[in-house]
Amino acid sequence: MILLKLYLTLAAILCQSRGMTSLDLDDLMTTNPEIQNEIINKHNDLRRTVDPPAKNMLKMSWDNIIAESAKRAALRCNYKEHTSIAERTIGGVVCGENYFMSSNPRTWSSSIQSWFDERNNFMFGFGPTIPGVMVGHYTQVVWYKSYKVGCAINLCPAQSLKYFQVCQYCPGGNVAGRKYEPYTIGEPCAARPKDCDNGLCTNPCAYNDDYTSCPDLTKQVGCHHPVTANC
């Protein structure tokens, strides 16, 4: 059965935090390879710590094309104007998106950690433990098959929350039908123990979850078999 995919564009709105005022916008530009490494390392470090553990969590890597897409989203300066699915479709793959806004610049590690900390109100397989609380940033950060990421920041001086950080993830997570199961529970790398880097799988397959059976089909016949053409 084909499921309608629900790719959530998510925004975290946080006010000024202490200890962040020494940063400058230039310190956070994602054209800097050091910043790219910080973003990737932070995501991968957090993905290794999910509880319950994940047997199929992919290792993330940086993608400049996705970063350019995230930059276009950041230039809008308005989290209410969500990036359309068409604009977030890169190479035929629909990507997910997380937003973060703040009154003062924050390190990328801090912003990503804030998304991840939504897990404090999340129960695997159930969803939010408090009605209405946001958990979609967390589930996107730890979505098992989102293995490419690109991020950007923009200064929006007309707004009180003027620092606008955007990350896009490909393939996107938060898929309808399993958005509260962002990965499969099991021993780290148990899905592909020969393709493993410290608990993260290194055998990505860029397919969309158009069918509930896509993960099993892809495992059996690979990414390029006609059976998985619509995965």
From Swiss-Prot:
Residues 205-231 form the ShKT domain. InterPro entries: Allrgn_V5/Tpx1_CS (IPR018244), CAP_dom (IPR014044), CAP_sf (IPR035940), Crisp-like_dom (IPR042076), CRISP-related (IPR001283), Cysteine_rich_secretory (IPR013871), SCP_CRISP (IPR034117), ShKT_dom (IPR003582). It comes from Varanus varius. It is found in: Secreted. Keywords: Calcium channel impairing toxin, Disulfide bond, Ion channel impairing toxin, Neurotoxin, Potassium channel impairing toxin, Secreted, Signal, Toxin. Contains 8 disulfide bonds. Expressed by the venom gland. The keyword Secreted applies. This is Cysteine-rich venom protein VAR10. Belongs to the CRISP family. The keyword Transit peptide does not apply. GO terms for molecular function: calcium channel regulator activity; potassium channel regulator activity; toxin activity. CDD domains: CAP_CRISP (cd05383). SUPFAM superfamilies: Crisp domain-like, PR-1-like. Pfam families: CAP, Crisp. Residues 41-169 form the SCP domain. Residues 1-19 form the signal peptide. It comes from the Eukaryota. Blocks ryanodine receptors, and potassium channels. Gene3D superfamilies: CAP, Crisp domain. GO terms for cellular component: extracellular region. Disulfide bonds join C77-C156, C95-C170, C151-C167, C189-C196, C214-C231.
